[in-house]
């Protein structure tokens, strides 16, 4: 399981065991979905960004180009919620606007973006929530092309072969922040953290990432898992 820490000015990759159970997976899944599903809110004050050096600006352009170049991706992930709940699983991404999370412990939980909406489904509880993709932090990662032109960089850390970048939206900075962590030389996307309006953080760390493969479009099609049960009660 991979997490990112900071020590003595460097960004380090930390490896530590985690205890995973069904309750933790559901808790983490709910927290992660809440972060991705959080709609943006109107800002009370303009955001304040850090002063970027020419090297920082060049690195931002490099990161934007790198992310935009990722057309498809498969990876294992570890997700940690604000309450400490931990879950693992696998994800698929296709640009623009499509992503699918499946959790190891509970196949009943699904998080899906289909270019238009982000869906959170819990089959055991027979619950589904959805919100427009472009109104969520997920859109910052899934849009095409990826750009920083409408974002404010509130933190930029450079370590030994690593970059950590925190951004908020210029128009709605109170909606939360997105922090991205990359290995460098060469660039590699390692982790993101979403902090929602309630200042609760959900972190997703990637491992065994693969890029550029053909993905079945059906992975990103929402299919109502409750349709059959509803039909049983229709007159």
Whereabouts are the PLM-identified features?
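Extracytoplasmic
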Residues: 70-72, 86-88, 94-96, 106, ...
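C-terminal segment of N-terminal export signals and the immediately downstream linker at the start
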Residues: 19, 37-58
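An acidic-aromatic
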Residues: 45-46, 90-140, 202-203
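Gly/Pro-enriched, hydrophobic low-complexity segments
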Residues: 149-152, 156-235
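N-terminal secretory signal peptides
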Residues: 1-20, 24, 28-38
